[in-house]
Amino acid sequence: MLGGDNQFQYAPNPVEWVDSLGLRGFRNAQGRFRGSLNIGEEMSSLPSFSNKTPGQIRSSLRGRGYTSSVAHSGGEIWIKHLPDGNTSAVRLDPRMVRNPPKGFADEVPHIHKESVPTNKVQNGNYKGKDAIQYNDLGCPSNKGSNPNHARDVHIPMQPTRGLYG
């Protein structure tokens, strides 16, 4: 079999092509690591939080410069203001209790990754209509174009005792 270009490969270099965990970081003109400058960089570099415990999520966000406050949902909201005038937000929501359960995505403890213009944030909170929602990979999602929107933006957390049990 002769060598050559593989037209069916999924990436030019599968070892270096994708940085899904955001470990690469960003570098400035001098080659030093820097933080995200805009919402696209921040959302795409957030790690996957699916099935992580609230403690693991908090630790990761704290290390990235996020601050927390109480969310309107009764959970927590972690925010980080960015130089482009946007705020990155990660909401930790307790499960919604329904009797009988309807099988909705919010019936388990979950998180949301969202962005909102910084001028719309008050005391760490904002209105849902002002937010753009993202899936766990950091890609924007909306009801109009994604039939799996509700499931994609309700990222399940590992249940724990207390509020997120």
Predicted regions and their residues:
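Short turn/helix-capping motifs enriched in Asx and small/polar residues
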Residues: 1-30, 165
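Catalytic toxin/effector domains delivered as secreted proteins or via bacterial secretion systems
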Residues: 24-165
